Design a protein with these regions (language model features):
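A glycine-rich helix N-cap at a beta->alpha junction
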Residues: 101, 105-117
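A structural signal for isolated positions on well-ordered beta-strands in alpha/beta enzyme cores
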Residues: 30, 84-88, 111, 125
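A glycine-rich beta-to-alpha transition motif near the start of alpha/beta enzyme domains, typified by
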Residues: 89-105
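Short, glycine/serine-rich, charged loops/turns that create anion-binding
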Residues: 36, 90, 131
């Protein structure tokens, strides 16, 4: 069975993007976007809470990774492209971890503003399975910690102005 017309069109578009990207890896790619930390807490949910019918997660391990535009920047770097990311993090532990993770992988972080008294966005996912099952992990909860206020206008203008120099 072959591809549908829609699938064939998507296939051709993806191949055109790959061909374009592979033509010239010497150019700069500028990314402007949200920068966040993704956290994953894995464990077993064998019991229900005695006070409410919700699973009790017994943690087995945690993982952290950069998310959103930072994830794309790291991916481009791993493919051999010179990318530069522009965005903002808070002056907190999560922001410092993001910068450390990106710098460890060779991503240029000079376009990331560190904003005092701002919370870096952290998205935590709690995933669980039954201890007796080999597979079948399921998302129990996503817990977001993020700033309610937009990035200050002066910081946004500085990020945009700096990014334009690199285009």
């Amino acid at each position: 069975m072959g591809m549908t017309d829609v699938e064939l069109e998507q296939h051709d578009k993806l191949n055109a993007i790959i061909e374009t990207l592979n033509k010239d890896k010497t150019g700069n790619i500028v990314l402007i976007g949200d920068i966040m930390l993704d956290c994953y807490i894995h464990g077993y949910a064998n019991n229900l809470n005695s006070r409410a019918p919700v699973p009790v997660l017994r943690e087995t391990h945690r993982e952290e990774d950069v998310g959103a535009a930072a994830h794309v920047a790291r991916g481009l770097q791993s493919m051999g492209y010179r990318g530069k990311i522009f965005g903002a993090v808070g002056d907190d532990k999560a922001g410092a971890k993001i910068l450390e993770y990106l710098e460890d992988e060779g991503v240029n972080t000079t376009g990331i503003a560190i904003i005092e008294d701002r919370i870096t966005t952290v998205k935590t996912r709690m995933l669980a399975s039954r201890e007796s099952l080999v597979q079948g992990e399921q998302l129990l909860l996503r817990w977001d910690v993020e700033e309610d206020e937009p990035i200050p206008e002066m910081a946004l203008e500085a990020i945009y102005d700096l990014s334009l120099i690199h285009i």
